[in-house]
Amino acid sequence: MMRPVVVKEKQLNESQIHAVEDEVRQAKTMDRDIVTHAMKQSVAKLNPKVMIKNPIMFVVEIGFIITFILSFLPSSSSSIPGWFNITVSLILLFTVLFANFAEALAEGRGKAQADSLKQSKKDVFANVVKENGDIVQVSATDLRKGDVVIVKQGEMIPSDGEVIKGLASVDESAITGESAPVIKEAGGDFCSVTGGTMVVSDEITIVITSNPGESFIDKMISLVEGAARQKTPNEIALNTVLTSLTLIFLIVVVTLPIFTNYLGFQIDTAVLVALLVCLIPTTIGGLLSAIGIAGMDRVTKFNVLAMSGKAVEAAGDINTIILDKTGTITFGNRMAHTLLPVGNETIEQVGKWAAISSVLDETPEGRSVIEYVQGKSISYNRELAEQGEFVPFKAETRMSGVDLQDGTKVRKGAVGAVIEWVESQGGTIPKDVNQKADLISKEGGTPLVVAVDNRIYGLIYLKDTVKPGMRDRFEQLRQMGIKTVMCTGDNPLTAATIAKEAGVDEFVAECKPEDKIAVIKAEQDKGKLVAMTGDGTNDAPALAQADVGLAMNSGTTAAKEAANMIDLDSNPTKIIEVVGIGKQLLMTRGALTTFSIANDIAKYFAIIPAMFTLAIPQMEALNIMKLTSPLSAILSALIFNAVIIPLLIPLAMKGIAYKPMSSNALLSRNLLIYGLGGVIVPFIGIKVIDMIVGLFI
C-alpha cells in the first residue's frame, strides 16, 4: 500500500524540479535580453542631447571626441607616439559606454517589469449600466470616470473602480503576485478594485474611478519604465556638488598649460584630457543614475509601488514611524480568551447570554465567542437568538446584540457603553465590573460587558496577539535612531500593555483619525520626517500629511491617492522594510561617492608624476607605485578609471548590505571600508594594469 504513495511523491518532486528549472531558464533568458538591450542602449545614449543630462560623463565624451580627432592630426610633441591619442580616445569611449550601460541596465529591469504589467492589460469589454437601466457592452478603453459596470464571475474587471453593490472574490495575482483571491464588497475599506484583475466568484457592480491612461496599472507601467522618474532632491544636490568639482578641475586643467609654458615645457593635449578625466569623479558620475533607478527597482521587487524616488529617499531619512496596532503590531483578530462572571452570576450564565448575543454576529469576535462557549460545553438556545432581531455594532453605541421576540434585550459591548445602557434602564452595576475590566485591560485584553436588560452578567475577555518578532524589529528601528509610535482606539490600559509587550517607544490610546494628523504634525514641527501606513478613507489626510505614506492596495481609492507608496501585498508591517530599502539607497550612494573620491588619490599619484617627470625630474619622487613609464602610468590610470565602473555595477544595482546601527557607527564603518578601500584598491589595480601595459610599450 505504501508503494503508490512513494511513486506519487517522487513524481510530484520531479514536476516541481522541472518547474523550478523552467523558471531559472526563463530568468536567464530575461537577464540575457536585458543585458543585450542595455548594450544597444549604451551606444544610443552617446547622443550629446542625452549625455548632457550627466555633465560629468558629458565632459568625458567631449574628451573622447577631442582625442579621437587629434589621433588623425600630426603630433605636436616628439615624446608622444602616434598611437597614444587613439588609445586614450578608445579608453574614454569605453568609460562613457560603461556608464551608459549601467544606467541602461537599471532601466532595462524596469522595462521588463513594465512589459509584464502590460500583459495584464488585455482588450476586454465591459457591461455598462445606462441611466435607463439598459446594459450596453463597450470596450474598456471607452470607459470614463463615473460609469457603472457589472462584472460577473470569470470576467476581467475593465478598469479601476469601487464596489457599490454586491460581494465577490477577486483574483489580484496579475498585480500583487498573490494567488489567493481577496474579498471585495460594497462599503467599508475593501471596496476598491483594480483593472486587470479577475472576478472568480459571484457578481459585483462597480463605479469607474479613472479615465483611460490614468488607471493603477497605467501608473505602475509609467513609474517602472522610468517615464515619470525625476531626480530626487538628494540626487540633484549630489549631482550639483559633483558638477561643481568637475567645473573646478576643468578650469585647473585648461589653465595648466599657461604655467607649464612659463616653466619652459608643454603638455600634450591628450595628456591634459587624461588628467581631467582622472581628476573628476567619473566613478560615481557613471553610477549615480543607476543607483537611483535600482533603488526604485528594489522597492518594486518588494511589491511596493513608489510614486517617486523622493518617497524612497525620504523613507531612508525617516525619524518616526506611526503604526496602527491592529493588523500591524498585532494580528488584529481579537478572540474570546475567557469569561469572567460578576457579582453572584455563574460562568454558565455569562456564557449562555454571551453566545445568544453573538449567534447573528458575523464578526471574528462574535464567531470566537460562539467557538469558546461551545468548547466549554456551555448550553444556550440558538433558535431563540435566530428568531430575534440582530442589533449590529455601531461606533455611536459601541454595542451589538439581539432583541428577542419576548422583548428581552441582550447586549455585549464596551464597558462604559453597556454600563450607561444598563443604568438608563434603572439597573444597578456590580461593584467588581470595573475592577475586572481593568484587570483585563492591564493584561492587554479588551473587555466586553454582557448584559440582559438592566442586569450585567459578566465580561468577555478578548485578546489580541502581538505578532512574533515585533519586539526585535522595533529594537532594530531603535538602533537606527527611529522612534515608533503606536496608535490604537483601545483604552489607555490596554494600549500601555500592548505597547510594553511589543516594545514600541510611545503610544496614543483612544486614537481617532484626526489624532494621527496631530501626532504627525507634532513630530514634523520638531524637524523630523514621519512615515505611516493606512488603508481607509479616514486615513487619507494623515497619509497625505506624512513624509512617507504607505497605503494598502486593498484599501480605498482615497487612501491610495493620498499616499506616495502603495503596498500591493497590503501588509502594513512592510513599512519597516521600506525604511530599510530607503536607508540602503542612501548608504549605497554615499558609500560609492566616498569610494569614487577616495580612489582619485591613487590616480593623482599615477598621472601627475607622469606628466611632469620629463621636465621636472624631482617629480619622480611622487612615483611611489614605481610605474613602468609616464605613458603606461597615464594609460593604466585611465584603464582603471574605466574598468572600475562595470565592476561596481552589481554593487550599485544590488545595494550595499544595511545593518541597523547608529549614524556615527555607520559613518565610521563606511569611511573605513569605502574610504580607506577607495584609496588602497586603485593603488593595487593601477599597479597590476601598469605591469600588463608595460609588456606592450
From Swiss-Prot:
Family (UniProt): Belongs to the cation transport ATPase (P-type) (TC 3.A.3) family. Type IA subfamily.
GO cellular component: plasma membrane
Membrane topology classification: Multi-pass membrane protein
Subunit structure: The system is composed of three essential subunits: KdpA, KdpB and KdpC.
Compartments where found: Cell membrane
Active site: D324 (4-aspartylphosphate intermediate)
Designated name of the protein: Potassium-transporting ATPase ATP-binding subunit
GO molecular function list: ATP binding; ATP hydrolysis activity; magnesium ion binding; P-type potassium transmembrane transporter activity
Source organism (scientific name): Bacillus cereus (strain B4264)
EC code(s) of this entry: 7.2.2.6
Residues engaged in binding ATP: D361, E365, F393, K394, A395, E396, T397, R398, M399, S400, K412
Keywords: ATP-binding, Cell membrane, Ion transport, Magnesium, Membrane, Metal-binding, Nucleotide-binding, Phosphoprotein, Potassium, Potassium transport, Translocase, Transmembrane, Transmembrane helix, Transport
Catalytic activity: K(+)(out) + ATP + H2O = K(+)(in) + ADP + phosphate + H(+)
One family name in Pfam for this protein: Hydrolase
Role description: Part of the high-affinity ATP-driven potassium transport (or Kdp) system, which catalyzes the hydrolysis of ATP coupled with the electrogenic transport of potassium into the cytoplasm. This subunit is responsible for energy coupling to the transport system and for the release of the potassium ions to the cytoplasm.
Keyword ATP-binding: yes
Source lineage: Bacteria, Bacillati, Bacillota, Bacilli, Bacillales
